[in-house]
Swiss-Prot record:
Enzyme type, top EC level: isomerase
Gene label: alr
Keywords carried by this UniProt record: Isomerase, Pyridoxal phosphate
The protein's name: Alanine racemase
Source species of the chain: Treponema pallidum (strain Nichols)
List of residues that carry N6-(pyridoxal phosphate)lysine: K33
Length: 377
């Protein structure tokens, strides 16, 4: 057994997907980019399919290829616009892609003409930038771009989409901004439809929009963070508590030392023992995703009790003040975060992220590859 493990509670994933589906009639496209936010894309996708998930979203062609190699046959949408080098792989693996420029259409059309498969096709979703400022065509270019897709042999229009910038905020100006984005998007959709074009899937809602902006559900939703157990902080605590963390990060006590009063611990001498105490050495550090910004202040759970991490977190290790008298032994399990329903302390990754001045997305994605993923089915 690896000393550092990310326990993936698939029952919690299924529970969260059930909660998501109870809140919308739209299809669910589950984001599994960044290895399913650190949870393991292939195993997560297989579990999600049994819950009725319609499709999956990835950030790049390589992620889509891994899903196909694992036997996932459901629709996959690549959220990044394609490069010339990637298009042949998109076509080969039957991956739909976002486009936002005429040049993307030309690249795909050329690749289709050069394909050895004379019947090859490529599904595309036209992305409209309604205020995010990233990938997407201007709203006044959307209809012409869709018409060009429909007129190009081998290309199939699969959807039209956008992305919200501040759907997780309840500030009045941000609520207005989200509604402005939604209205601009709907104007584009209506204009396209009036031109005689049918759009199979209209989609925009991320996790925050799913919970807070029901008028933005449309035909399909893309809830990532919710599926993995975390709702935006702006959501009412009663709603947030319904979603259960899927990942539990655990390690073990590798060594225990007694240190005298006045002794320093770790780099830069950031912590000094005020009295004689015991410290435990944990074989986990920032290379594993336990960010340096978490100390001081991070608490870990050992045997149902909380202990503070002290001193600077190192690349491969960190130190815990175990106090006196000593109630911990070498080899004891240590939980850094995880769901309470799994018998853990109930300290979620959102608590750690807030302490580190970041967001749960970043903390979950940062859990390193040398942390073994163990799937609890």
């Amino acid at each position: 057994m690896a000393c550092n493990q990310a326990l993936i509670h698939l029952a919690n994933l299924r529970h969260n997907l059930g909660e998501i589906m109870s809140r919308t009639r739209a299809r669910v496209c589950l984001p599994v980019k960044a290895d399913a936010y650190g949870h393991g894309a292939c195993d997560v996708a297989q579990a999600a399919l049994s819950c009725g998930v319609h499709s999956f979203a990835v950030a790049c062609v390589q992620e889509a290829s891994q899903l196909r190699a694992a036997g996932v046959r459901a629709p996959i949408l690549c959220l990044s616009t394609p490069t010339a080098e990637e298009i042949s792989s998109l076509i080969e693996h039957r991956v739909h892609t976002v486009i936002s420029e005429r040049a993307h259409i030309a690249l795909i059309a050329r690749a289709l003409r050069q394909s050895a498969d004379t019947g090859a096709t490529c599904g595309v979703h036209v992305k409209i930038d309604t205020g995010m400022g990233r990938i997407g065509c201007a709203p006044d270019e959307a209809c012409a771009l869709v018409q060009m897709v429909c007129a190009t042999p081998g290309l199939h229009l699969e959807g039209v989409c956008t992305h919200f910038s501040v759907a997780d905020s309840v500030r009045a100006e941000d609520l207005q901004y989200t509604e402005m984005q939604r209205a601009h998007f709907m104007h584009c959709v209506q204009y396209i439809r009036k031109s005689g074009i049918s759009i199979p899937l209209v989609h925009a809602a991320n996790s925050a929009a799913l919970l807070c902006h029901p008028r933005a559900h449309f035909d399909m939703v893309r809830p990532g963070l919710l599926a993995y157990g975390y709702a935006p902080e702006s959501v009412h605590p009663a709603v947030r508590s319904v979603f259960l963390p899927v990942m539990e990060l655990v390690t073990q006590v590798r060594a225990i030392k007694k240190i005298p009063a006045g002794a320093y611990v770790s780099y830069q001498r950031l912590w000094r023992a005020h009295t004689e105490t015991h410290v435990g050495i944990l074989p986990i550090g920032y290379a594993d995703g336990v960010m340096r910004a978490l100390s001081p202040g991070l608490q870990v759970c050992i045997g149902g009790k909380w202990y503070p991490v002290v001193g600077a977190i190192c690349m491969d290790q960190c130190v815990v003040d175990l106090g006196t008298p000593l109630r911990v032994t070498v080899g004891d399990r240590v939980t850094l975060f995880g769901p309470q329903d799994a018998g853990g302390p109930g300290q979620g990754a959102d608590v750690l992220a807030s302490h580190a001045g970041t967001i749960p997305y970043e903390l979950l994605c940062a859990i390193g590859k040398r942390v073994e993923r163990v799937y609890i089915r």
